[in-house]
Amino acid sequence: MNIVEQMKERIKEEIKRAVVSAGFAAEEEVPEVILEVPREKAHGDYSTNMAMQLARIAKKPPRAIAEEIVQHMDKTKASIEKIDIAGPGFINFYMDNRYLTELIPTIIQAGASYGETNVGKGQKVQVEFVSANPTGDLHLGHARGAAVGDSLCNILEKAGFDVTREYYINDAGNQIYNLAKSVEARYFQALGIDKEMPEDGYYGEDIIEIGKKLAEEHGDKYVHMDEQERLAFFREYGLNYELEKIKKDLADFRVTFDVWYSETSLYTSGKIDETLALLRERGHIYEKDGATWFRSTTFGDDKDRVLIKKDGTYTYLLPDIAYHQDKLRRGFTKIINIWGADHHGYIPRMKAAIEALGYDPDVLEVEIIQLVNLYQNGERVKMSKRTGKAVTMRELMEEVGLDATRYFFAMRSSDTHLDFDMDLAVSQSNENPVYYVQYAHARVSSILRQGEELQLSYEGDLQLDYIQTEKEIELLKKLGEFPSAVSEAAIKRMPHRITGYVFELASALHSFYNAEKVLDPENIEKSRARLALMKAVQITLQNALALIGVSAPEKM
């Protein structure tokens, strides 16, 4: 807990003590003390609505309650300079902000670990994201899911959760049969043999490339092979080719996974049969019209769901239930799925299945990723200029850069549509948020280099009482918010809280830089203190940007 968190706790304790001392409630009956940062600076550093919370119990006007609470408070116990009462009874606290300078050596000493919290308490959390079918390129929806998922994992780890990152490989089912048939057709065509593409085939350039590669390396070796053997080979070849491509694209996007979980393994291990037997044993399965049904309405779904069709084939739901059963057996306290917008209706049946298996349905959390619209020159970009098809993740990365892509995708709440302005993403101006933030880091790094050239060091004993101007205090306050921003982003599953935070920190830095002279050869101790402040800003910017997968350049 850093000095800011400690101070907030002291204020809360002092409010609680004052409430008890004033006779409004016994210690165990005092409502939770809520401290908020007022929107207007004029309303102080912190504010509480405790008087309103107590009004019903005390049967007094909130303002009168607030006055009594203030009378019983000891300001010296929490570095409070002034307290006032506003509106119907809000209590506003104005801090003696000199205590904030203690943050500077704390941050420098913590380095890359600054911002770490323990709200997760080591809980085992699994985050499954991207999980695109291995039948073609990753597109914009996958890219946004990758950026949000990876950022969320980084944030959860920073907040003390034990995180497993998982990609579910959809390597069973009809789409993989169609992949094998598509590879077969392209292979025959590469040899000059007429072969029709399957009705639901994959027409991407990558499948044409696979066909050519096979023809070049193996000639007509597979033409005369038994068809089932040939398709089994093409299935594996095509699947591995596409998976390696996906892994490479994701690695280049700074996204890695701990587990690549194969859907096929659910069949070969008997886990699907085992899950079906368990649901049957619990009385949640019935037969109707030649099909096998899951009685999901028992658990709040709007209708029962087919698990096995009349022809004996499985619906998507059955292996998905088996997969979630396996997740739960691995001991995760939370399983977080990051799904595309088209999966919204799938959530109730999945939660129903989890409850039917005997688990708490709230163990499953689903974050929905809404659609992305690309804009260039003020117009919506629907197709790639190069391929005439949907824009891929790699194309976007190459067009606007990795950092801009990662930042923009994590900039808004994932459940809202995102309009991605490609012109803005590449512009070197303060209107471009990623440029603005990275420039703050480059600016701080430049100041630190200048300090080295002047042989000024921020190490050793510092006279931190030089740090006292309004802009310096604003910067310190923002630095002190980082751990709570991490905790909030983790608990609320909000990566965009960090993009918002890092932008605010950059803004505070630019504002300070424009108002103050950092290095003054005439005042060595003041310069050293300010250099230490700049080092603390540099560390915090680096740590925040790392959470959202964005680099922190030293020069721009």
Swiss-Prot record:
The gene coding this protein: argS
Annotated PANTHER family: ARGININE--TRNA LIGASE, CYTOPLASMIC (PTHR11956:SF5), ARGINYL-TRNA SYNTHETASE (PTHR11956)
Alphabetized InterPro entries for the sequence: aa-tRNA-synth_I_CS (IPR001412), Arg-tRNA-ligase (IPR001278), Arg-tRNA-synth_N (IPR005148), Arg-tRNA-synth_N_sf (IPR036695), ArgRS_core (IPR035684), DALR_anticod-bd (IPR008909), Rossmann-like_a/b/a_fold (IPR014729), tRNAsynth_Ia_anticodon-bd (IPR009080)
Compartment list: Cytoplasm
Domain of life: Bacteria
Organism from which the protein derives: Geobacillus sp. (strain WCH70)
Enzyme class: ligase
EC number: 6.1.1.19
Protein name: Arginine--tRNA ligase
Residue stretches spanning the membrane: none
Biological process per Gene Ontology, one example term: arginyl-tRNA aminoacylation
One GO molecular-function entry: arginine-tRNA ligase activity
Catalytic activity: tRNA(Arg) + L-arginine + ATP = L-arginyl-tRNA(Arg) + AMP + diphosphate
Subunit comment: Monomer.
Xref: PROSITE patterns: AA_TRNA_LIGASE_I
Family affiliation: Belongs to the class-I aminoacyl-tRNA synthetase family.
